[in-house]
Regions:
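Feature activates predominantly on carbohydrate-active enzymes
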Residues: 1-82
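Substrate-binding groove of N-acetylhexosamine-processing glycoside hydrolases
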Residues: 56, 61-62, 75-291
């Protein structure tokens, strides 16, 4: 077990509501984290969220809150006190579950070999911040288990744990979305080509594996996940997020379909307001394509 078990949440482009922050802290406590690191590139958004209340809530759960800037984060690497790994939520739309799992295994082994005192799970934002919070859950859950349980955590039943966290049978659906980036073999480190297609209209022509047949296959799986998750949307905000993640992937497969894009733009605002303060929403929405 690592002495320090930390989760870093990037608040540079979007800031969670107090309710969301408390829900996240509850999840961290459940998976034996003892350090919560709100991150900002420079100044912290003091006017948007009460860090005093967050710190007090962390303390109630046996967690230390440590504000972290870019300089602080880089200093962690210089001191090499932590084995660091990403949730792989950024630049993904719906996650990169297998890449995340492999990184967890490597980070735990390397941290143990050099006797690192901490295990740090990072959850950075990308320039678009379209992905819903649920996309980070597999990394948070698995990271907590690796930090406290070591290498044997690679065999954990992640789907079952996600069902418990979301209090609904959504874990398998979320993991299914989180493996679609592997289709067609167009794999990049720390990025999904489906994200590239939606955000920059690139990827399709550069990767022969991403044929229209493959994109149609991804779209079909995403629609199936959406239909299954929709049965729970009246009872679970997590289900709403899973539906939205599925729709993002579907839009990436049909990037020039204005009807799909209009629907996901409408959904974007609703999902954002579930979890985050209003600031940043317009900037994120503006990056979704229009035709």
């Amino acid at each position: 077990m690592f002495e320090r078990r930390a989760y870093l949440l990037d608040m540079t482009r979007r800031v969670p509501t107090m309710r969301t922050a408390q829900e996240l802290i509850d999840i961290l406590a459940r998976y034996r984290y003892n350090e919560f690191r709100p991150f900002a590139e420079k100044g912290f958004p003091e006017e948007l969220i009460d860090f005093g209340r967050i710190g007090a809530y962390c303390k109630m759960q046996g967690i230390e809150m440590v504000r972290t800037t870019r300089n602080d984060f880089e200093e962690l690497f210089v001191r090499a006190e932590y084995a660091a790994v990403s949730t792989e939520a950024e630049r993904s739309l719906a996650g990169r579950v297998e890449e995340m799992r492999e990184q967890m295994i490597r980070a735990e082994a390397q941290g143990r070999a050099r006797k690192a005192s901490g295990f740090l799970v990072t959850d950075f934002s990308d320039e678009c911040v379209w992905q819903p919070l649920c996309v980070s859950l597999p990394g948070i859950v698995m990271g907590g288990n690796f930090a406290s349980g070591g290498a044997r955590s690679s065999m954990m039943d992640l789907e079952k744990e996600l069902d418990r966290v979301m209090e609904a049978p959504l874990g398998g659906l979320l993991l299914r979305l989180g493996t679609l980036y592997l289709r067609g073999g167009a794999v990049r480190e720390h990025c999904s080509e489906l994200y590239n297609i939606l955000s920059h209209d690139i990827g399709y022509s550069r990767h022969p594996g991403l044929t229209q047949f493959v994109l149609d296959d991804v779209s079909g799986v995403a629609r199936g996940v959406r239909i299954a998750a929709e049965r729970w949307v009246e009872r679970s905000d997590w289900a709403k997020e899973v539906v939205y993640a599925a729709n993002l992937l579907d839009c990436a497969c049909h990037r020039r379909d204005e009807v799909r894009l209009r629907e996901v733009r409408d959904e974007h605002g609703h999902i954002w307001r579930l979890r985050f303060v209003p600031e940043g929403r317009v900037e994120s929405l503006a990056k979704l394509p229009r035709f």
